[in-house]
């Protein structure tokens, strides 16, 4: 999913809204038709389009018109025009990948990057936007976001400092790549060969088949630090010796990344200082919903403290189980996953294979749409539309009898589709410079087991949760009602709350009354038993407090590390200090977790890892507001739609939440959701 935060940032994105157009017989179409006329010529056509847009931007910049309507309205229309051309390619390259789509996509990206850089360096446009004000709150939010985007790109810096910032950005990118490459090299360099069958006796056949190989004509089992292989042995590996060996290798990967971290931290601090922030954590919050570094730290510490007591109980139960079953008296970190899985099986006797026959894809999809319809008083009608694969399903959305949006579902795996699941926004609800209203559309993409002529697509419960999650992103965009494109739908929504609506909707996928709507055996049509339904929720909350404490540890380390400049051994000392309140087992000295923390050193989560739990508190609190003893609380659900979904990025999420419920979200709601007693 792509997230737009400002005019400057949106030109970088690969997903944009699409303008309305006429079809071949001159009849107005409500939605863009999915097609690409000529893949081979696409990059050349894009080059011409971008040149035309830059000429238009130059004309806007040089004009005497300094009104919002004369400057920012047409600039947002250009975003639509660009998306009108580019979205079909970016989407097609992900869902029907081929040499032709990849070639066109790769040739297009440098053009978009250059285009974005040109806009970022347009000092005259920046000065013009700074003079604009509006009495319309949505329009003023667009203005504020755009000014912020220019400032954070260094538009107000003197020339020499601007060059320094550009050099820092380039070096940061190089260091992030180095961190990733070092980690990849270290991951690929390790192999653990097991020759004795008894040491792999408990590993599921599907995992064992991946590990099985031959050396000198003898069958052996090779495990690596690739996540599926690593987790397979840590979770099911019988031998403590081998669990320790692979755990030590994983925790001590890429020691050369320690120097990379020092360089990254130094440059991030320099970048923050150049842009007049005290720290990189403070810089990070400039585009987020959290208001201060103190607020984030207090939130994390409160969450950790409230989960601590139950986490200790969960660990003691685990240690007692290991002692009872295998006589383990010196319980270690490399024992946790193995005994957690064994205890889970003893307590619940449950796995996904028991529920999969009850989750037929078509019934799950229809059931989910019914839930959304009932919650938000909308209607989904299946329609015929041009699509990229015959298994894609398309629905138009109606609100109070009026057409309000369109959603495409591409749910089954195929070799041409990249892995994972995502929501890709397409058209956006807004009013253009000519006063015409545009309707939103979006793609929901998953990789569920394919259906055949004889057998339907059956989902694991995790798949059901994934579908609800991505639909939560979808309705955040599709239910947007703002007139200003840059803050409508998911556009302009802060990074630390973008997962709020998705996590909100996925919560319903664990509720027995919801699952009963569509959990029927695909052959006998028998409903899923109450026993199985209860186990789905019970296993979700298994060792939840330990999980929360672990996430708090990661988040506190990330955020505090970016509060000031830490170098060398100071980094490990900070992590050790945080672990005094979050790590319930001693951590061996060889553990250098930070050297593999790619989320913050090679990804987009630097000083932002807290976002996962920040958004989850909102989603849990909203969930409990929207249900009551009779099922859905329609009044609260209507308010959620009005204040949270309809208003998109037009106001800070904390303000919208206050307007909806008249209070701040409660951390206790998240703890309640995970069955953690306070």
Residue ranges of model-derived segments:
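N-terminal helix-rich structural modules
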Residues: 26-202, 626
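Active-site-proximal, well-structured secondary-structure segments within enzyme catalytic domains
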Residues: 138, 142-143, 171-174, 181, ...
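Short His/Asp/Glu-rich catalytic/ion-coordination signatures at enzyme active sites or charged loops
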Residues: 30-41, 89-108, 132-167, 224-258, ...
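C-terminal, non-catalytic "cap/extension" segments appended to globular domains
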Residues: 29-39, 44, 48, 62, ...
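Short, positively charged and aromatic/hydrophobic N-terminal segments
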Residues: 14-25
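Short pre-active-site segment immediately N-terminal to the catalytic Zn-binding motif
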Residues: 451-467
């Amino acid at each position: 999913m792509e997230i737009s935060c400002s005019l400057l940032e949106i030109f970088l994105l690969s997903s944009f809204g699409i303008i309305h157009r006429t079809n071949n017989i001159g009849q107005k179409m409500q939605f863009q038709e999915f097609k690409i006329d000529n893949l081979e010529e696409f990059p050349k056509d894009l080059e011409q389009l971008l040149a035309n847009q830059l000429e238009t931007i130059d004309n806007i910049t040089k004009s005497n018109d300094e009104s919002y309507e004369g400057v920012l309205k047409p600039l947002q229309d250009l975003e639509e025009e660009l998306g009108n051309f580019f979205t079909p390619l970016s989407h097609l390259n992900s869902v029907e990948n081929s040499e032709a789509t990849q070639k066109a996509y790769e040739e297009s990206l440098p053009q978009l990057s250059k285009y974005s850089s040109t806009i970022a360096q347009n000092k005259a446009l920046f000065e013009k936007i700074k003079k604009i004000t509006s009495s319309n709150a949505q329009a003023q939010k667009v203005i504020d976001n755009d000014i912020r985007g220019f400032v954070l790109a260094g538009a107000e810096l003197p020339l020499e400092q601007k060059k320094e910032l550009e050099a820092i950005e380039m070096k940061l990118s190089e260091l992030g790549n180095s961190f990733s490459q070092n980690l990849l090299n270290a991951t690929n360099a390790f192999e653990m060969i097991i020759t004795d069958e008894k040491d792999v006796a408990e590993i599921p056949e599907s995992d064992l088949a991946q590990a099985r190989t031959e050396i000198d004509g003898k069958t052996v089992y090779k495990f690596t630090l690739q996540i599926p292989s690593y987790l397979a042995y840590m979770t099911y590996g019988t031998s403590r010796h081998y669990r320790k060996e692979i755990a030590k290798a994983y925790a001590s990967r890429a020691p050369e990344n320690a120097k990379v971290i020092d360089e990254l931290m130094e440059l991030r601090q320099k970048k923050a200082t150049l842009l007049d922030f005290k720290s990189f954590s403070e810089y990070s919050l400039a585009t987020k919903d959290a208001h201060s570094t103190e607020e984030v730290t207090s939130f994390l510490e409160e969450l950790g403290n409230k989960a601590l007591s139950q986490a200790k109980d969960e660990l003691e139960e685990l240690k007692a189980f290991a002692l009872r079953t295998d006589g383990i008296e010196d319980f270690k970190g490399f024992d946790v996953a193995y005994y957690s899985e064994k205890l889970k099986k003893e307590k619940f006797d449950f796995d996904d294979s028991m529920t999969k026959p009850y989750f037929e894809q078509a019934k799950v999809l229809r059931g989910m749409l019914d839930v959304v319809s009932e919650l938000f008083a909308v209607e989904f009608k299946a329609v015929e539309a041009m699509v990229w694969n015959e298994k894609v399903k398309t629905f138009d959305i109606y609100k109070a009898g009026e057409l309000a949006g369109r959603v495409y579902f591409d749910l089954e795996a195929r070799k041409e589709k990249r892995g994972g699941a995502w929501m890709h926004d397409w058209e956006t609800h807004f009013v253009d410079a000519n006063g015409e209203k545009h309707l939103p559309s979006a793609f929901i993409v998953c990789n569920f087991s394919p259906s055949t002529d004889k057998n339907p697509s059956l989902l694991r419960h995790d798949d059901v949760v994934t579908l609800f999650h991505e639909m939560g992103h979808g309705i955040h965009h599709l239910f947007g009602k703002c007139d200003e494109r840059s803050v409508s739908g998911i556009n302009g929504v802060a990074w630390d709350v973008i997962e709020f609506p998705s996590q909100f909707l996925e919560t319903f996928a664990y509720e027995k009354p919801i699952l009963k709507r569509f959990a029927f055996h695909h052959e006998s049509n028998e409903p899923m038993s109450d026993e199985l339904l209860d186990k789905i929720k019970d296993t979700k909350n298994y060792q939840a407090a330990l999980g929360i404490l672990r996430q708090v540890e990661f988040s506190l380390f990330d955020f505090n590390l970016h509060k000031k400049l830490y170098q060398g051994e100071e980094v490990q000392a900070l992590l050790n200090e945080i672990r005094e309140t979050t790590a319930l087992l001693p951590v061996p000295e060889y553990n250098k977790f930070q050297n593999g923390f790619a989320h913050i050193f090679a990804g987009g989560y630097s000083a932002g890892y807290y976002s996962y739990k920040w958004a989850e508190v909102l989603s849990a609190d909203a969930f409990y507001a929207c249900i009551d003893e009779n099922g859905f609380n329609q009044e609260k659900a209507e308010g959620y739609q009005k204040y949270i979904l309809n208003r998109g990025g037009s106001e800070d999420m904390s303000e919208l939440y206050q307007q909806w419920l008249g209070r701040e979200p409660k951390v206790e709601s998240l703890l309640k959701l995970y069955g953690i007693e306070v």
